Amino acid sequence: MVSIEAMKDSNWDLQIQVFRRRLNPEVIEARNEIFLSLPSDHGLITLVINKDKPFQISVLLEKNQEFMQTAMNKYVETAFQNQKTTLTSLFNYLLQNWKSFETCNTKERELMVQQVDSKKPETPTDLEPLANKLEGPLSERVHLNTTLDYEVLRGQNHCQKQNTTQTKTTISGSEQLFNDEKPKKIIYSKGGNDGKEDDLQNVNEPQDAYSNDHDIQSKDTELLGNEYCLEWKNPHLTNVGTLKAPILRLVIKCVRCHYGSEISIATKFSLVCNKCSNTLRLVWVPGVIHPNNARLGILHTLGCVPVDVMPIDCQVSCMECVDEQITSFKGISSMQPMLQFCKVCKNRILVEHQDTEFHLLKQRQSSMGGKVSAKKKQKQNLNITKGLPLPNNGACEHYKKSFRWFRFSCCDRVYPCDECHDADQNHTFEHANRIICGYCAMESFYKKDATCPHCGNMTVKKQTSAYWEGGKGMRDRVRMSRKDPRKYKRKHHGN
């Protein structure tokens, strides 16, 4: 077994840097300790690292999880005896085995409750023996804070709120870690002395890079439209610490003309639709996928809608390596597991997911970029009666031999032809799959034979003759029969 002192100068500082770089915790530095706080599904988890003694850390949990904290600290004391254990792998192990820690220490919790119930102090002076023990490590101080809070509530039921707040702040400053506001000051005891004098030191809280980038990107995305969340469905990760997708390739669709485009976006991207010249804007905020998070990132769109995600190029960090060893995966697709081996530790890295899903988080603007309106779409009043013919049998000024109206799928409105649609709407028409007969005003699906299934009439005049027939027959010289003398006459005599 390698001693801790021999490993002090080699990789302990590097492990802390890798942990801060991968998981972006909230960092608070004191004189002798470093606090790394991370939110999780189980609440706020804080790792307290001793600057003077490498590989000596303790875990702090929320107020209602003290019994879990004792079990985790017992495991942490012997975890670094294994040479392959790193700070990042230790944190992931605690999250993955949360339920086992939750059930292993129920007896100790019951004993702690019995000890607290047996103590019944009458005055606040009974708290002095416990307050003298605050010179110990921070993990013990949090347990004492819980005991002190419980006894204060039992001994002083009618005390003022100001007295209780003063008692809590003078006992320890570690309790501020569990408040909603970020702590700016930390109270710690001087080491090596009797521990009666406490020093108050202002701590400048360094902001991590992720929070700065997120704030900058949030300002840029305030003017954009909808916000989508990209998540992997049922991800299966083996020996993966973190996974990032800095560049996203996807297919988008214009909200005006529904024209599809394939793009590749790193942070910001803007383009003009090739069909309707609509401006499309996107902002990609990549996230971090780990065993407890399946969110790939956040996508902000304006003037377009995401349709599908192309194969993704990801950067995967190995969980077993001490340094930040990144392995590149190219073309990760759904339902296709990809396997690679780490270049340093030679362990296999497996990445697999079932599907990529889009979830609409915020709809701040409509599809055209304006504010979202709560009004429903007004129904089109056609002024027609089923069974009776349409006005002019459905013919319009553009197509005088077309006896039908079309219901266009782009706006679900009825027009005689595509030119009538474009003259009334501000977007380009899409193919109409339903028609209204000009003779009976009955709606049906589009058919190539142009025969109404209700009345049997032809909605388009069928050309059967190959002769001129006084202008009622064939008028195209190319398709006209060569037996018709009008086919070879001069053009100024033909019309």
Curated annotation (Swiss-Prot):
Pfam families: zf-CHY. Residues 473-495 are annotated as: Disordered. One of its GO terms (biological process) is rescue of stalled ribosome. Signal peptide: none annotated. Zn(2+) 3 binds at residues 437, 440, 452, 455. Residues 473-483 have a biased composition (Basic and acidic residues). PROSITE patterns: ZF_CHY. Zn(2+) 1 binds at residues 396, 398, 417, 420. GO terms for cellular component: cytoplasm. A zinc finger (CHY-type) spans 389-457. Keywords: Cytoplasm, Metal-binding, Zinc, Zinc-finger. Zn(2+) 2 binds at residues 410-411, 421, 427. InterPro entries: Znf_CHY, Znf_CHY_sf. Residues 484-495 have a biased composition (Basic residues). Its main location: cytoplasm. It comes from the Eukaryota. The keyword RNA-binding does not apply. It is found in: Cytoplasm. GO terms for molecular function: zinc ion binding. This is Uncharacterized protein C18H10.09. It comes from Schizosaccharomyces pombe (strain 972 / ATCC 24843).
